[in-house]
Amino acid sequence: MIEKTYQPADIEARISRAWEDAEAFKAGRPERRDAVPYSIVIPPPNVTGSLHMGHALNNTLQDILCRFERMRGRDVLWQPGTDHAGIATQMVVERQLMERQEPSRRDMGRAKFLERVWQWKAESGGVIVNQLKRLGASCDWSRERFTMDEGLSRAVAKVFVELHRQGLIYKDKRLVNWDPKLLTAISDLEVQQIEVKGNLWHLRYPIEGKTFDPADPSSFIVVATTRPETMLGDSAVAVNPEDERYTHLVGKHVILPLVGRRIPIVADEYSDPEKGSGAVKITPAHDFNDFEVGKRHHLPQINVLDIEGKISVADNSAYLEGLPEGAREFAGEIDGTDRFVARKIIVARLDDFGFLEKIEPNVHMVPHGDRSGVVIEPFLTDQWYVDAKTLAQPAIAAVRSGETTFVPKNWEKTYFEWMENIQPWCISRQLWWGHQIPAWYGPDGKVFVAETEEEAVGNALGYYVEQEVITPAQAHDMAEDPAKREGFITRDEDVLDTWFSSALWPFSTLGWPDETPELDRYYPTNVLVTGFDIIFFWVARMMMMGLHFMDDVPFPTVYIHALVRDEKGAKMSKSKGNVIDPLNLIDEYGADALRFTLAAMAAQGRDIKLATSRVEGYRNFATKLWNACRFAEMNGCVAPAGFDYTAAKETLNRWIAHETVRAVREVTEAIESYRFNDAAEAAYRFVWNVYCDWYLELAKPVLMGEEGAAKTETRAMVAWARDEILKILHPFMPFITEELWAVTAPRDGLLALAPWSRKGGISDEEVSVLAASAATDPMAGPAMLAIPEPQEPDFTDDAAEAEIGWVVDLVTAIRSVRAEMNIVPSTLTPLVLAGASADTNARASRWSDVIKRLARVGEISFADAAPQGAVQLLVRGEVAALPLKGVVDFAAEQARLEKELGKAEADIKRAEAKLANEKFVANAAEEVVEEEREKREAAVARKVKILEALLRLKNAS
């Protein structure tokens, strides 16, 4: 029996246990051994993480797909797991050590510290997994993976070694994003651009051979910088080759102020003649653009900072090279000072000597570490790199050929732009937590790359014996006793970028490099669901690695979902205080309400503006479903075994069968094409409007009437349609539907494993494709041979739809006019059907009691034409008239509507004035501009509705 009130908290934990006990989500269930496989890999959340709204959206959409395909009979693997999250995890544990006043990471040493990290992971690393379960994620939790599991670590080592052997991994000195607090290189994704009110310092660089005079512009070139401290590392001044002001100076030199270094004036298109003086200082070791200019002109790379962001020039051979003796004194003065302290010293000294032309206030974006919060430095250092350009070519070709497609398609352009301009990928990090790079160094710096230490040591010792650096006896002793080779062979201390192991996720989680049955069955996966912000960092790299090591794309479809913003459209952030916690929403409204909200708002390419009122609204929808099922139960609605909905005799029941089949088709096609919002809308509209508001309402007289064939059939149809509803809603609202499935009738099993509504199995098109593959591919596995029967044609009953649809449309139109004209419910209005066809007359007679009750209509009459003073409604091509003379004061109603029209027009004018203001559009926050657009659209819609009402009044009077 169904409880009187719907309380999600009472059912969610119980339903979760039922799924777990039945191993409902386990891939490779015995009864699905021959089913068509369907697989998705979860974007692994950080092991340090907790569920945020982005996770909630991403995993809700994946779960909709997995539950949908599982109900269609497929063998579904939704592969779960977590990422070791190098920096984040190391910081969490270091913070814990500090809070507990324990020895620091460095005092503890690497081995002991890593033990503590693993201990923390065991104690606290499963938080987000449990939160995903609360959301209802139907992953195969028995297969949960971690990016530092033994098997995945072996895959990482093998990939590194293979790519190194192929010349696609190498060591190089290049610029990286350097975090002076965490003392490591970080990825672009870990860099946050923050708007800062700073300055632009305009500096005078004296031209060699001329006497410097601040009053004589011909004696110097002006350059501008936001980072004056980096001038210590300048190695050129660049001007545009087309800039006639400087043509005569190209090839000459300037003398770097304070430093005394002689640096060339080079011609390069990087310099923009329209910006500032048109000349720019070039610091190859401290600016990414300057680094490229430096390569083009073979300029020296002079690093003037140490790893902590302090000036390092006193013993810096690159800095000191070629400097006059007198200039070295300044190096001693400034050496060891913090970069921002040095900035003040340098600016003051430049001003003292007349080298500072002006200081200009300047608001600009400054890169900060998203975890450390400090300003990031472009820093020249030795790191390990992947030749991403070579690996990118097959990945570009796969998307160009359509082997992998993006949904929405416009994201392919973003993918191509990045891939076609891809830079070497820095994969080393100066951390302790992560996959330690499998490279060992000999005493002369020679590198030995191998999957295991044993192999690397063997290779190294063999090499040095051959080179006669050590004897065979020494080599034997070193091989046997690690202590004897200490200092002779040392391992690279760096670890790999977290994204390196994540790039292998689609195949490493399936057992690669071993040739496992799971790898053969579930790779490639069917779709990747992810956010646009990691197209470069994760999607592109999985494409590269999948094609290189598996010789196949990791997924044929990439679905890119949008951002979840606050209700005004602003990006959620802790600093703004507008972060909405999904767990709080689950506690208050239930997981199903949150899931349905996210799905209903997940229109392709459009960010979600999340308001708690929407979640509350869908909680009400869940309550509506609950109450509809209680109504069916209280009226004894049960579908007997073998019930055939297509054999229904009653027009109303044939209509609901027609509408149910249509709703199933709409939901199915929308999910298949990743139109989650359309699928949710179709389900919502059918359940609330068609089934609850109309079918159950129209069926009440039968259900409450005398026993007979009509009542028996209606009870069965109410139950059948209810079950179809539970099926199409299950991917969106799994908890409530599973509960109602269990309590509404005796069942053979869980709804999660029940067959999908009518269109069971897979699409007709897919059936034909699989059949063709099975017929032509001798290697086709059992899954390929499990071809479902072709689908039967959709059930339709156009006559039933025409009849009941007319009743619904007529009542809806009358209700709309009554509301529009403020007619009180107690006032019954007459209805005249003007020039009605014989079919319409017959329908009106059959359904007169229903029309009168639901539309608050008194007498229903028929006439050749609409009477004077009647509001005319067009219902399915025929006129229905409401004689309202004496019921409505037409003049007063017209005055009211005209007043409303004036307000709507004023709102339109106000919004359009703002949107026409270029300064407003350019400077206001994106969400504020979008809000004005929405105000305009709402006012325009209101105006159209009022004009329609005025036209009706005019025609009536």
Curated annotation (Swiss-Prot):
It is an enzyme of class 6 (ligase). The keyword Ligase applies. InterPro entries: aa-tRNA-synth_I_CS, aa-tRNA-synth_Ia, Anticodon_Ia_Val, M/V/L/I-tRNA-synth_anticd-bd, Rossmann-like_a/b/a_fold, tRNA-bd_arm, tRNAsynth_Ia_anticodon-bd, Val-tRNA_synth_C_sf. Residues 887-946 form a coiled coil. Keywords: Aminoacyl-tRNA synthetase, ATP-binding, Coiled coil, Cytoplasm, Ligase, Nucleotide-binding, Protein biosynthesis. CDD domains: Anticodon_Ia_Val, ValRS_core. PROSITE patterns: AA_TRNA_LIGASE_I (PS00178). One of its GO terms (molecular function) is valine-tRNA ligase activity. It is found in: Cytoplasm. It catalyses: tRNA(Val) + L-valine + ATP = L-valyl-tRNA(Val) + AMP + diphosphate. Its EC number is 6.1.1.9. GO terms for biological process: valyl-tRNA aminoacylation. ValRS has two distinct active sites: one for aminoacylation and one for editing. The misactivated threonine is translocated from the active site to the editing site. The C-terminal coiled-coil domain is crucial for aminoacylation activity. Belongs to the class-I aminoacyl-tRNA synthetase family. ValS type 1 subfamily. Catalyzes the attachment of valine to tRNA(Val). As ValRS can inadvertently accommodate and process structurally similar amino acids such as threonine, to avoid such errors, it has a 'posttransfer' editing activity that hydrolyzes mischarged Thr-tRNA(Val) in a tRNA-dependent manner. This is Valine--tRNA ligase. The lineage of its organism: Bacteria, Pseudomonadati, Pseudomonadota, Alphaproteobacteria, Hyphomicrobiales. The gene is valS.
